[in-house]
Amino acid sequence: MSSRPASQLFDAYFTSAPMRQVFSDQGRVQGMLDFEAGLARAEAAAGVIPRALVADIEAACRAELYDFDALAIAIGSAGNSAIPLVKALGKRIAASNAEAERYVHMGATSQDAMDSGLVLQLRAAIDLLERDLATLSRQLAAQAQRHAATPMAGRTWLQHATPVTLGMKIAGWLGAIDRHRPVSYTHLRAHETRHDI
């Protein structure tokens, strides 16, 4: 099972292959599984579950191990995505370590798994956005220098105005990106690190 683009014709305008992967069905499931692995690590560190069982739980927290067609059917019946995924995770772990299966999802709700999984997807998306904006900034800076003396019509209220250079126009775009990029990224990361899994 895979996520189809929202629009086969226009999706390429608004996203990228790495971003599609982050928000694919596999990315969604992996986010919830990463939550489950993180939960097991945190509970072991707090002495709630035996530390020796964490490796068995982590080993089963890989999205490629699961049957997405079966999950899709089960999700339709369950009404949310976490219930059938946690059942499948428990079943997979029980096959190799019945004791570890008892501690899967311990103390968590379905909403915890879904919300935390989404936050982990958003974390990956933020990293992609920052990477792409850094690349865009470098490319705009290079083009602003390259076209520092390239004349173009200035515009005001949809009319031609005093001539400007293309380099100056591009530098304006660059300035807007560079003013907002560090603030946005730092703000998002500051909120995220307080709740690191």
Question: At which residue positions do the language-model features occur?
Answer:
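A helix-coil-helix interface module used to build multimeric assemblies
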Residues: 1-189
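Single conserved hydrophobic/aromatic residue that forms the stacking wall/gate
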Residues: 187-197
